[in-house]
Amino acid sequence: MDDLSEANGSFAISLLKILSEKDKSRNLFFCPMSVSSALAMVYLGAKGNTATQMSEVLGLSGNGDVHQSFQTLLAEINKTDTQYLLKSACRLFGEESCDFLSTFKESCHKFYQAGLEELSFAKDTEGCRKHINDWVSEKTEGKISEVLSPGTVCPLTKLVLVNAMYFKGKWKAQFDRKYTRGMPFKTNQEKKTVQMMFKHAKFKMGHVDEVNMQVLALPYAEEELSMVILLPDESTDLAVVEKALTYEKLRAWTNPETLTESQVQVFLPRLKLEESYDLETVLQNLGMTDAFEETRADFSGMTTKKNVPVSKVAHKCFVEVNEEGTEAAAATAVIRNARCCRTEPRFCADHPFLFFIWHHKTSSILFCGRFSSP
């Protein structure tokens, strides 16, 4: 599973870099883990050069059974007895006239707890789009709707890969609501007021001199997950951090051994992010081109028909970050800016930052985010 976690991690950072390049000021929030597993499910049915390109983009080595490893990984992350709420909707929708193989459908269920549903895009395009949106809404308990906007599918659509995630975690120890107040958040162009949460407690924190930034780890309940925030120093642009970022560096920068636990004054904005992506172009930029081209796509492990390309890869994610924790906020004497606290570390996320939600047991990046525009 270590190989797979590493492959998924590298893919996550590749995805983050491409998405962040597209629009420097846009908020980002996506689940690389679910994009990887959804694509790996499609990879089950890929052959020839299509399969080679997919395995290269996903960083999958030929060693061991990739699908078996994904099965183990997904079972661990999607456990039901957790303190965090993770609702996922992942399914492949195929044009019913494509004659999909039952062996492929069975493997989707076995390894990915996901299915292939056959619809008639040719006969009822709009009906299919609505059906897919309704299914996603139901699976995410209404948190995510409209994963496919009007015009995203057409009568010629053959394969649509849909993937949506809703995440709500509770902090190990909550932020006390009575200290949340409006504070300015500085973007490159302007200042906007955000609801800034405050907590004065022991956290693991570090400073990376290489890129001039602070690193803070905030544990979620039961410490199964944690949010790791990369916050550039006031004098450094977030783009500098993004440019330097690689999966290896992220592991080194956020290694618990290199962080020091101490009393920290933490200021973190309340967040509610809902982000949507059509990933076809992004994946083509990464080198996965044949899968999307009618004359080159080889999915003979999935269907008996030739010329069945992937038409759409839709991904949508929703996260809420607020004060809620599983334990009451400890009664701390809050001294925000008093002189006696000058020596104490301060982590004030009042300008753009990156954040990652880690699943510790599997060393997986569950989510990647950038908050740059309140």
Curated annotation (Swiss-Prot):
Chief place where the protein resides: cytoplasm
**Where exactly are the transmembrane stretches of this chain?**
none
A Gene Ontology annotation in the biological process aspect, one of them, is: epithelial cell-cell adhesion
**Cytoplasm keyword on record:** yes
One GO MF term: serine-type endopeptidase inhibitor activity
Q: Where is this site: Reactive bond?
A: 339-340
What the record says about family reads: Belongs to the serpin family. Ov-serpin subfamily.
This chain's protein is named Serpin B8
**Species annotation:** Mus musculus
